[in-house]
């Protein structure tokens, strides 16, 4: 799986709402913050993300802050963002 350039990522993100280019552990990543009414809804969302990630065999970094969940996607083996990350972002 080939690592994408920042320009390729920006173009690919245009149809995927609210995801943005970022950096995680020195590698290019994409991330999005999801907001919920309360902690219970946030955790229910995290559980759905976990199921989807297990099915896909591709796991985001998940940061939980009460009613906010920040997901960060990057393909660690490739050292940056690949099509796997964009597919997961679009599915969420």
Curated annotation (Swiss-Prot):
It comes from the Bacteria. Pfam families: Pterin_4a. The keyword Transmembrane does not apply. One of its GO terms (biological process) is tetrahydrobiopterin biosynthetic process. It catalyses: (4aS,6R)-4a-hydroxy-L-erythro-5,6,7,8-tetrahydrobiopterin = (6R)-L-erythro-6,7-dihydrobiopterin + H2O. Its EC number is 4.2.1.96. CDD domains: PCD_DCoH. Signal peptide: none annotated. Keywords: Lyase. NCBIfam families: PRK00823.1-2. Belongs to the pterin-4-alpha-carbinolamine dehydratase family. HAMAP family: Pterin_4_alpha. This is Putative pterin-4-alpha-carbinolamine dehydratase 2.
């Amino acid at each position: 799986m080939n690592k994408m350039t920042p320009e390729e990522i920006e173009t690919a993100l245009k149809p995927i709402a609210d995801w943005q280019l970022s950096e995680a552990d020195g590698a290019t990543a994409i991330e999005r913050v999801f907001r919920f009414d309360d902690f219970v809804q946030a955790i229910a969302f995290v559980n759905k993300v976990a199921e989807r990630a297990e099915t896909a065999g591709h796991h985001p970094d998940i940061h939980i802050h009460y009613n906010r969940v920040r997901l960060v996607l990057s393909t660690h083996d490739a050292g940056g963002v690949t099509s796997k990350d964009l597919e997961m972002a679009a599915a969420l």
